[in-house]
Regions:
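N-terminal export/targeting signal detector
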Residues: 1-9, 18, 142
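Compact, glycine-rich, soluble single-domain proteins
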Residues: 9-99, 104-106
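Acidic/glycine-rich phosphate/pyrophosphate-binding loops and surrounding catalytic core
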Residues: 87-151
Length: 151
């Protein structure tokens, strides 16, 4: 059990509301230039976030794995607030749906390679869709055993 003075409050908010809320002794978020590890008494911070995996280590030492979309993280007074366009815990991810989304995004990107069809494809959106789907698959695979992990 972690010392109460070394505890963070974490909240992950999407357009649908609060997706995750709890206590942690470590939060790792996907920053634009790499992962950011946040522990208690961290300096105040606001950082843009990339599509990636957010990991929350609970005071009991268990990890929650969450696929998060584009957004930002705010750290202030032992509180971490992640505001992003999407968030899914590993156990909530439908891998078949994520695989289908990945295939659709890959097909759109392949179509964009043809100059004649390029105007019909929004390359940026297809690329972001591929990143989201790949991230969801990766996070779900880390959690294939079910429940929070020890590492």
């Amino acid at each position: 059990m972690a010392d109460q003075a070394a505890i963070l409050h974490i909240e992950i908010v999407t357009p649908d509301g609060v997706d995750y809320e709890g206590e942690a002794d470590l939060v790792v978020v996907p920053g634009l230039d790499g992962e950011l590890g946040i522990m208690a008494h961290h300096e105040p911070l606001i950082s843009l976030l990339a599509i990636g995996e957010t990991r929350v280590r609970t005071p009991e030492g268990l990890y929650e794995h969450i696929a998060t979309g584009l957004g930002y993280a705010e750290v202030l007074f032992n509180r971490v607030r992640v505001v992003c366009d999407s968030a899914e815990r590993a156990l909530e991810i439908d891998t078949a749906r994520a695989e289908a989304a990945r295939r659709r995004a890959e097909e759109r990107l392949a179509t964009a390679a043809d100059p004649a069809a390029r105007a019909e494809v929004d390359f940026y959106r297809a690329e972001q869709a591929l990143r989201r789907a790949t991230n969801r698959i990766k996070v779900a695979q880390r959690r294939a055993g079910g429940g929070p992990t020890r590492g």
